[in-house]
């Protein structure tokens, strides 16, 4: 604080004005970012990587880890943690309710049933639509009305794979819900979606889900369900192709009114990528340096992130931005 006071006293009015203009120019791209962007945490044990992901200078505002409680490796003071009920066992477990009750008030949304139309080998929960509907009404809905989990949670419908099978599963799930409860079905607050593929396919899949939940369901205005894209990547492509896809995708999702949040699947090092996605989705190389994809997702040089930057060091742009943000603008203008 004393240093800032000295700076203010040593600056002339013209220099103060120049500082304000420079700060304004730097902050415009950051202020333009909303809170849609987050990441899926798959278990990166490198502290430097996690420090970069949780930096307040990134546009990242939330994260999840396919579990009802946050990982100890991720300091979450700058991020909202979003819990997930992965499968049937977690839905009916008293432990899940205790874990949710222990979360900070900043956690308000709850994801349910990860890829029930997928196999457990691929990370899915492998649940039939009928069993999922029964468990949803008996257990998951209780988190929504506050009778379990310590508060009233906003809950999602199950997040299926981005495929024809996923859509058919959702249709069967919805029908089963109304077979059990003809009046309410399986009430939900938002929709969770996954997409692995090219940009045009993503746009088509989101349009399909919006039509299924909103247009066909006659939802309008404030009643329209928002979509969260909780897994997103372009598998098995080279770095240049993947960067091109991300360059098209980020502004599209940021501008789409019915998409509320999204998370890239790639918050890890290239060597930690699975065989199916390939290492082109990774935000970090094996030395912990930001890939071109990683620098782009974290906001680029305008936010102080550059290709090759490591989490245990700060780029020049980042240092300048941090210094300017820490200045009390009201005092600078005096």
Language-model region placement:
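Active-site clefts of carbohydrate-active enzymes
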Residues: 122, 157, 218-249, 265-284
